[in-house]
Regions:
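C-terminal alpha-helical interaction appendages
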Residues: 3-92
Length: 92
């Protein structure tokens, strides 16, 4: 019996008509995709990006944050209509 794979979030974006939206690649942070903005930009959850990177690369929280800040967040201003990274407000 073959087991049916759960579709990736990228696949779900394509099925919903957002195949032209810009997504991260290498790493993809697929499990951190949480939605799409009204103008069609893919929204990622920052905390889930960190968790995804830590899991995929077997690294510490600090190493994951450093990689994401330097290699991903820093590049966002140079990508027109690029992804949005959501940082949740801290609870008081």
């Amino acid at each position: 019996m073959t087991r049916k794979r759960k579709p990736t979030n990228r696949h779900r974006l394509a099925l919903a008509g957002y195949e032209q939206s810009i997504v991260f690649s290498n790493p993809s942070y697929d499990s951190a995709i949480v939605g799409v903005s009204t103008d069609g930009r893919v929204i990622y959850d920052y905390d889930l990006m960190v968790a995804d990177f830590m899991h995929a690369n077997h690294c510490s929280y600090e190493d994951a944050v450093n990689f994401i800040e330097y290699n991903t967040i820093r590049s966002l201003p140079y990508v027109p209509n690029g992804p949005i990274v959501l940082r949740k407000l801290e609870e008081e």
